[in-house]
Amino acid sequence: MEKRTKYPVFLMKKRTNILQSNFTGDRIALRCIYMLKRKAEKDIVNFLNSTDKKALLISGARQVGKTFLIRELGKRHYKSFVEINFLENKTAGSAFENATDTKSLLFSLSAIAKTELIPNQTLIFLDEVQECKEIVTAIKFLVEDGRYKFILSGSLLGVDLRDIKSVPVGYMDYLDMYPLDFEEFCIANGVSESIIENLRECFETKSPVNETIHSQMLELFKLYLVVGGMPAVVNRYLATNNLADVIREQNSIVQAYKRDISKYDPENKLYIEEIFDLIPSELNAKNKRFIMKKLNDNFKFSRYENSFLWLKDAGVALPTYCVDEPRSPLALSKTKNLFKLFMSDVGLLASMYMNDLQVKILSGELSVNFGSVYENAAAQELTAHGFPLYYFNNKKQGEVDFLTEINGEVVPMEIKSGKDYTVHSALNNILSNSEYNINKAYVFSTANLSTDGKIVYAPIYMLMFIKKHEPKDMIYRPNISRLLANK
């Protein structure tokens, strides 16, 4: 029997999968699709259960799992599920363009779907809406009608919807989806919830992790650096455990991104592709900052700015901006033309490097500097948890990898791939500066959990526990009794 995984049984729980048949000529190819648990499911279900007259617009890079998750939840929660894909159905867009009112819009929907729309029991999923921008404007009238629920989705939404003049304020909720974060990856690989909760407790109480579990979690994190979080790639790994299959799937996604560049921005195609192709080498440089002169000796940021924005808005790249000082709010001191550019998925980044990097990561080859992939994983994790990305660099004080804001306080983070994780002069400099008033910092590495003054040394996999605190209920009623009219 083929060995499905190398992780011990006490870390594992049962995985659910379905078999899909693909008919190609006379051949039937069976492929195993694992039901990946996604955190976005909770937000989508909350929307489906709400009584608000709003639509939900789900954004995210191509192939992060938007369409699959919406279909699964829509069919599970609604008697009638209608899907219209504006990329596959070119006539659908023209039908909406010609609609003049809510009645004609709904008639067009019913005609395109070739099914009756059941009031209060129908979810209408409009996919690839970047191909029909008019529907985003028209959604206000559809949700005001109140008889049907609407979810909109598509790839490159940040790019293609920038120029819409009439975005329906107050009629749309928004949700960003990303590749699987590390916790989702752990669950996909069968790590039990009790193990994750035990690790979370260790993180919150600053207690060392059991050495056996710590060692195996590091192995799983190394696998994450190679596989990444793109659902198709994760499913391919779970089905075969074959890294060659993983790399082929990743290469396919990278090529799809490049085709999108040619299709959606042909005028700036060469600039965008050049920047995209430079990301791995720039991250492998000493300071990891994107050096503009690599693009052109006479580089002017204004000339290339839209190309950088395209990669960001398409969800392909994650810019991390330099700030002048580690003070809250960080956005006020960011420098827009000084940044690092990470890939949206660490597995895709690893696939863009040559020389069997994947094997070297998994074997822990000491001669290789894994700093770029470790930092990319950190950028990806922080982004998935809703943090804008910043770093600090100062000639006198040095550079700190990431700065985040938690509860209004700046929290610096260093990412260390080697054994010298306690060496961090720049971090020491800003912690000792009383003007910055920084109370806590993290150093993430392969070491077990420990503390030293303001610094928490945590295992790299515990990045999954860095979260924004949810706002608590704050009921406040001012005393305005003297202002009220006498009754």
Task: Describe the predicted segments one by one.
Residues 8, 19, 235-407:
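Accessory nucleic acid-recognition modules appended to NTPase machines
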Residues 88-119:
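Short glycine-rich substrate-engagement loop in P-loop NTPases that contacts/grips substrate
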Residues 36-51:
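Pre-Walker A adenine-sensing motif
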Residues 447-487:
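Domain-level recognition of nuclease-like catalytic cores that cleave nucleotide substrates
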Residues 149-155, 176:
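Structural recognition of the conserved hydrophobic beta-strand(s) that form the central parallel beta-sheet
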Residues 69, 73:
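Hydrophobic positions on the alpha1 helix immediately C-terminal to the Walker A/P-loop
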Residues 161-285:
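Interdomain motor-coupling "hinge/lid" segment immediately C-terminal to the ATP-binding subdomain
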Residues 66:
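Conserved lysine of the Walker
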